[in-house]
């Protein structure tokens, strides 16, 4: 097994600077509180009885600290090349990958902050990560360009051992970036959840990278650690202020920043399949939410749980709509989901006609349906435990079940 002392010197420097980044994030967020409120980048917590103004878009602070850390860190992986005797050839491909990754993340932070300020529509939320992922795809094209995949064992009699996907591989990577940036944004709405799930995912990736340092792809995992270590500590600083009762909101800025950072290391670190497995709860939440996201079933602006003032606990939130406004497909999906105990449906009739009411289709509301009303802090902890369980399952698949599909 590797020892701490055997870690590359740039990684140790990265760790030290990241610890300073944690302190900076914890310090800067309250220091800028007044500036955000003065700029009207603030809002009220809908699940609290207090109507205190809370600063929003604080992900821009953790994102800025993250970028400063990595901008200052850029020379350290290439220190040997500052000494001519030790530098055989400058690793231009590594430098391009580092700069391209930072460009993609920087673009996503900027576009995420624009979303927080301008309150963009959902169709724009799909275009933003697509645009920000272009530098990432160009880096992959110029540095690697490999679009061949190893076919899983069950499909080899049909497709062979290797399959060249060509341009479809770039489409897959672009869709991965779009999914990662929006998946965290969809599973959100209660104190500490966005930053908490990102913290668990980043910790899981760090563990995975450290385990793989002895493997054949050591350089790829070292590259991933350059990003994941500072991301973990800056997110930890943000979570300190975002934990229940939240003193700040992370905003769409953080969700986009986190998602693009994960997409960057997954694509350029060549472990995108493992990355998707770490997103297991987010994938389930996305699939469960799809009927509302596609507006097959009416989707309100906010799908967060609602607070029962008497009990102080969160309960399911509902979407109410006229029954006749639901399409045949929507009616079919609702009936199937109800028969599978995935949604609660109520019918009512008023002077205006017949109405249907169903719980909003998110993982948060599904847990409340199964377990009943829960205190907000406990609900966040439960969701983070599910995220940890998802990571444990991912490691089991990656190091045990993978033998059923690939030669390892």
Curated annotation (Swiss-Prot):
Changing residue 116 to A/N: Strongly reduced UDP-N-acetylglucosamine-dolichyl-phosphate N-acetylglucosaminephosphotransferase activity. Changing residue 185 to A/D: Loss of UDP-N-acetylglucosamine-dolichyl-phosphate N-acetylglucosaminephosphotransferase activity. GO terms for cellular component: endoplasmic reticulum membrane; intracellular membrane-bounded organelle; membrane. It is an enzyme of class 2 (transferase). Dolichyl phosphate binds at residues 125, 178-186. Changing residue 160 to S: In CMS13; increased UDP-N-acetylglucosamine-dolichyl-phosphate N-acetylglucosaminephosphotransferase activity. Changing residue 302 to A: Loss of UDP-N-acetylglucosamine-dolichyl-phosphate N-acetylglucosaminephosphotransferase activity. InterPro entries: DPAGT1_ins, Glycosyl_transferase_4, GPT. Disulfide bonds: none annotated. Changing residue 108 to I: In CMS13; strongly reduced UDP-N-acetylglucosamine-dolichyl-phosphate N-acetylglucosaminephosphotransferase activity. The chain crosses the membrane at residues 11-38, 59-78, 92-118, 122-143, 167-186, 193-213, 219-242, 251-269, 272-293, 376-400. One of its GO terms (molecular function) is glycosyltransferase activity. Residues 1-10, 79-91, 144-166, 214-218, 270-271, 401-408 are lumenal. The keyword Glycoprotein applies. GO terms for biological process: dolichol-linked oligosaccharide biosynthetic process; protein N-linked glycosylation. UDP-N-acetyl-alpha-D-glucosamine binds at residues 44-46, 56, 191, 301-303. Tunicamycin A1 binds at residues 46, 119, 185, 252, 303. It catalyses: a di-trans,poly-cis-dolichyl phosphate + UDP-N-acetyl-alpha-D-glucosamine = an N-acetyl-alpha-D-glucosaminyl-diphospho-di-trans,poly-cis-dolichol + UMP. Changing residue 182 to A: Loss of UDP-N-acetylglucosamine-dolichyl-phosphate N-acetylglucosaminephosphotransferase activity. Inhibited by natural nucleoside antibiotic tunicamycin, which acts as a structural analog and competitor of UDP-GlcNAc. Activated by mannosylphosphoryldolichol and phospholipids such as phosphatidylglycerol and phosphatidylcholine. The keyword Glycosyltransferase applies. Pfam families: DPAGT1_ins (PF21383), Glycos_transf_4 (PF00953). Changing residue 385 to R: No significant effect on UDP-N-acetylglucosamine-dolichyl-phosphate N-acetylglucosaminephosphotransferase activity. UDP-N-acetylglucosamine--dolichyl-phosphate N-acetylglucosaminephosphotransferase that operates in the biosynthetic pathway of dolichol-linked oligosaccharides, the glycan precursors employed in protein asparagine (N)-glycosylation. The assembly of dolichol-linked oligosaccharides begins on the cytosolic side of the endoplasmic reticulum membrane and finishes in its lumen. The sequential addition of sugars to dolichol pyrophosphate produces dolichol-linked oligosaccharides containing fourteen sugars, including two GlcNAcs, nine mannoses and three glucoses. Homodimer. This is UDP-N-acetylglucosamine--dolichyl-phosphate N-acetylglucosaminephosphotransferase. It comes from Homo sapiens.
